[in-house]
Amino acid sequence: SKKWFWQGMMKVEQQQKGSYREFIRAYAACAAFADAQIGRVLDALDRSPRRDNTIVVLWSDHGFHLGEKDHIEKFALWEKSCHIPFIVVAPGVTRPGTRCDRSVDMSVLYPTLLELCGLPGDTKCDGESIVPLLRDPTKKWARPALTTYMRGNHAVRSERWRYIRYADGSDELYDHENDPNEWDNIAGDERFAAVIASHRRWLPKNEAGQVPDLRRKPGR
């Protein structure tokens, strides 16, 4: 079903022609403003004596749908919600202007920073350092990216495929080589059973328990 925000946006668009366009412009303006402020911070770093001894990491916690797949929001496991900017500058490790097309998630951030800083790691950490990719963006990477939205709903993104498994047992599979906009869910096609199986093995085996709603406790 369509989300309330998208439904509300469509209603506003019908009543006030051009309101959707204004929403897109406002979103772009916010992104441009944030970009300018980040530039100010980086300019200050370039002028400082710590320029060559500072690791810079820029990332976002989520992407955003701007009407794609009938959504104007972030609450989904599709590409537009899960794909985020992730930029790392590590003096002596990364090279300016390089790009890596491997799929990673934010569990890599902690172990990566530990390795870059030469600090001891936590053996229980779920993530894996991507320093090898920072040194060589073309290096092979077997581990896909995992995204979770609420309990039991997960997406596994490899370089070609996005597999989504929902808490109700339903699933989706998209081939980004032939369907980059994720219009055609091919999870029901038996030809891709092996692809689904290879991605399912990356789903979490255990999940944390439900968080109690403290607002309902007496005295809260």
Region locations from a protein language model:
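Active-site-proximal cap/lid insertion segments
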Residues: 1-103, 116-124, 165, 182, ...
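C-terminal cap/loop subdomain of S1 sulfatases and analogous C-terminal strand-loop tails that border
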Residues: 62-68, 94-95, 105-110, 115-176, ...
